[in-house]
Amino acid sequence: MDGPPPQEEDFSTLSVADRLTHKNWKARVSAYETLVKTFQTTVSDTDPAFKPYINNTDLLKRIVADSNAVAQEKGVDCLVAFVKYAGETAAKTREAILPVLVEKCFGSSRAGTRTQAVELALQYVEVENGGAGVVVRGVSPSHCLDPIFF
């Protein structure tokens, strides 16, 4: 253990698309943080920044189901920003994302992931049809949240 510690790899030189699918979890976290900043600076819910993600639910599902716990939490945070700022445009991703979110995040050992997962579910309800949307067909919202809070 002689010499200085190895330098952290700089992932900012890679494109966001490359970082989102990178094998290193730190690269994926970097992409998620970049996307949160991008989504926060959009001027409308029809901004072109959302287009690559609206029609790519497979990528969004991979973000929610990230194998690294830290990256998963940042990924769910990224999707909260995505749904919040893309608005009703993002509502069409709900049907693909929520089952994975419930399976992978609601029971997470990380409190931050659980909190963000609930926030994401609530964001979907808020943006879809003015809050009158169905979260999971056939299941009442109180039934979904009972195991988490009670």
Q: Where are the predicted features?
A:
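Core helices of alpha-solenoid repeat scaffolds
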Residues: Q7-V16, T46-K61, A90-V102, N129-S140
